[in-house]
């Protein structure tokens, strides 16, 4: 069985789209629609990887990433965002993101990013 992925995005449409891409490739997907739910699901589900939107209502992606790092310094996170600013990419990497993927994501792009990050830990 492939890895378990926690998918965090406040857009139900974005979650559904990425979920379908990942599940079609054999990944198990757990969803969270906001930062607090993401932290709870991470603690309960122990996913191998987190796909994290940067801009969300309430707690933003960088805040979620910081809290995840406190919970688990080895957490693997791919930031998935429509924010194409180079500074956003730098902030995400500086906060500990393993990769950064720009929305809208394509199936090959997201699967490659997930496989690359998971390969590093296997």
Q: How would you label these PLM feature ranges?
A:
Residues 16-24, 90:
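Charged docking surfaces used in two-component/phosphorelay signaling
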Residues 63, 84-99, 112:
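Alpha4 helix (beta4-alpha4-beta5 surface) of REC/receiver domains from two-component response regulators
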Residues 57-58, 85:
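The feature encodes the CheY-like receiver
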Residues 50, 54-55:
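The short loop immediately C-terminal to the conserved phospho-acceptor aspartate in CheY-like receiver
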Residues 34-37, 60-63:
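Acidic catalytic/metal-coordinating carboxylates
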Residues 26-33, 41:
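Short hydrophobic/Thr-rich beta-strand motif most characteristic of the beta2 strand and flanking loop
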Residues 105-114:
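C-terminal output helix
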């Amino acid at each position: 069985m492939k890895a378990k992925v926690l998918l965090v995005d406040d857009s139900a449409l974005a979650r559904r789209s990425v979920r379908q891409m990942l599940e079609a490739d054999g990944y198990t997907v757990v969803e969270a629609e906001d930062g607090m739910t993401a932290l709870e699901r991470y603690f309960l589900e122990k996913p191998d990887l987190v796909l994290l939107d940067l801009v969300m209502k309430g707690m933003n992606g960088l805040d979620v990433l910081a809290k995840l790092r406190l919970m688990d310094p080895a957490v693997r996170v791919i930031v998935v965002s429509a924010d194409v600013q180079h500074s956003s990419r730098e902030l995400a990497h500086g906060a500990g993101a393993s990769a950064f993927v720009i929305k809208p994501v394509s199936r090959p792009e997201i699967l490659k990013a997930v496989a690359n990050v998971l390969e590093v830990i296997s």
